[in-house]
Amino acid sequence: MGILQDLEFRGLINQQTDAEGLEQLLEKESVKLYCGFDPTADSLHIGHMLPVLMLRRFQLAGHQPIALVGGGTGMIGDPSGKKAERTLNTKDTVAYYTESIKNQLSNFLEFENVDNPATMANNYDWLGNLDVISFLRDIGKNFGLNYMLAKDTVASRLETGISFTEFSYMILQSYDFLNLYQHHNCRLQIGGSDQWGNITAGLELIRKSEEDAKAYGLTIPLVTKSDGTKFGKTEGGAIWLDPEKTTPYEFYQFWINTDDRDVVKYLKYFTFLSHEEILELEKQVAEAPEKRAAQKALGAEMTKLVHGEEALEQAIKISAALFSGSVAELTASEIEQGFKDVPSVERTAEDTVLIDLLVESKISPSKRQAREDVTNGAIYVNGERTQALDYVVTEKDRIEGKFTIIRRGKKKYFLIRY
């Protein structure tokens, strides 16, 4: 099965130019393709996952991906999908973001020791020294104003306003494609569905600049959720690929909590499971949704892919401990991950009567309530129910000398930090 057939099965093709010509080219030779990533933060988030994994899919199929980091365009701002003007970052900030993103991309693509190595490019290398006269004479003259105004990315902003800076973004991205076509023989650009206007503008520039040019564009669908909320966002904000911003446990939980209506679609979009494995999981969703086999597979595949096997095992262990209440077996680093958003209080490492600890840490509102909670068996210290009114929290209750986990009732956790 060819790469395009696999993408069709997975629902990963939104629009493409000259489908027949592209299919013939991909069957005939190892093709260079690119996708651009503008450095707007110091980490990629899961909204970037689909295009990153598309590059990986093409590489696994024998083609040569170019990961283009927009050190130049990142200083301008892409108006695509934006209702208002972006805040421009400083040159130093963009350079820092660029380096961070380059490091992350290297986790997904093979840059050496393979027959079809991926390459990394930074468009600042050719845009940074581009002078205004050359830009207007050699590139700008190929773009009719009516043509640009008709593009969705621009048309959608005409009423609210768009600066000349962002208006020019399409021309710069088009020049990227031309540059990569001329200097790297890059024949295909891929991107999100909101990039269709920019991609086709690039193809038009190549057509006008190069005789008998054969270049192609392909977009992937916008990832949606059945409940109408935005994919990749939670109450806590974006889901980042950087483990310092989103812990592997939080990352795993994001996928595990996928709606039954979306899980098969996400297995197709994001994982490298075979068609047969996905169809089997689809069957399990229909026959035994309560077992959440598809969600577990999705969570495992994605966490392993982004954070590695060890981080996945930790995430599963934390999830199981929180579900069962057996938290004493967790290490300090696992507690740090799993209890990141739990109310916590700093205390000195000294022996304290449990009743006093509950009140002083504001777990119970009063001593009377604290005594009642303990007597009624509502208080757990590191997962163990504690009903003795004179119980003293000592060194043995401090996990690795750093934490004591208090639970009140079935699910209300509190973290004591030392």
UniProtKB/Swiss-Prot annotation:
It is an enzyme of class 6 (ligase). Residues 352-418 form the S4 RNA-binding domain. ATP binds at K233. GO terms for cellular component: cytosol. Belongs to the class-I aminoacyl-tRNA synthetase family. TyrS type 1 subfamily. GO terms for biological process: tyrosyl-tRNA aminoacylation. PROSITE patterns: AA_TRNA_LIGASE_I (PS00178), S4 (PS50889). It catalyses: tRNA(Tyr) + L-tyrosine + ATP = L-tyrosyl-tRNA(Tyr) + AMP + diphosphate + H(+). The keyword Ligase applies. Its main location: cytoplasm. The keyword Transport does not apply. PANTHER family: TYROSINE--TRNA LIGASE, MITOCHONDRIAL, TYROSYL-TRNA SYNTHETASE. A motif ('HIGH' region) lies at residues 39-48. Its EC number is 6.1.1.1. Keywords: Aminoacyl-tRNA synthetase, ATP-binding, Cytoplasm, Ligase, Nucleotide-binding, Protein biosynthesis, RNA-binding. This is Tyrosine--tRNA ligase 1. Homodimer. It is found in: Cytoplasm. A motif ('KMSKS' region) lies at residues 230-234. Catalyzes the attachment of tyrosine to tRNA(Tyr) in a two-step reaction: tyrosine is first activated by ATP to form Tyr-AMP and then transferred to the acceptor end of tRNA(Tyr). Pfam families: SYY_C-terminal, tRNA-synt_1b. CDD domains: S4 (cd00165), Tyr_Trp_RS_core (cd00395). L-tyrosine binds at Y34, Y169, Q173.
